[in-house]
Amino acid sequence: MREVQDEASPGGDATRDGHADEGTSAENAAAEGAARTDAAGTTGLIVGADGRTRPLWAASDPLLREYYDTEWGMPVRDEQGLFERLSLEAFQSGLSWVTVLRKRPAFRVAFAGFDPEVVAAFGAADVERLLADASIIRNRMKIEATLQNAKATLALRDEGGLASLIWSFQPAQTPRPEHARDVPSSSPESIALAKTLRSKGFRFVGPVTAFALMEAVGVVDTHLLGSHRRGSSGVWS
């Protein structure tokens, strides 16, 4: 998932950067050129045409830019929202995050809006249906893990719920990275979270995936200090 840290991108895999849609506009091409120029700089940040400062990965594709500006790092505290993000982080493993974002609408249809009660009731026929659905990422292990994770999510309700568990691993302090290379790919808290999730029956979640989840839902803030989104979650000052 984040085995190779790439410009502090969500999930951080090496394929995340440089996968723009076909027909990239002149504006995006210019932004990418600026990104390449800035790559030798000291921050790993670029200033977009709108005057806002972002990390390189968030400037490489319009969909990533929108995701960065509106979603990534904002607090998610509801069960369904967290189950969706945990599921998508697992599906992203080995792939680029922009691929997941492009397929997210189809994922939501295929997995009933990531309602854990519905997904937990999926059976063998549903697995075959999902494997035949070209609009999503067709990987049997990831699909079966998602079904198991839905069941584990329901079981957690007797212990306070998925949101309570994930947010209980919020650290006392969040990273304050000045450059993309300063962003960690895991932490003591993500190691502990992954271990706890696995003990509760969750699959396809390790320390790196757990940290990417924590970043995505605001448990930690790894926005670079010079980014226009730093501190936007309201969780960290």
What are these regions (language model features)?
Residues 1-28, 32-237:
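HhH-family (HhH-GPD) DNA N-glycosylase catalytic core used in base-excision repair
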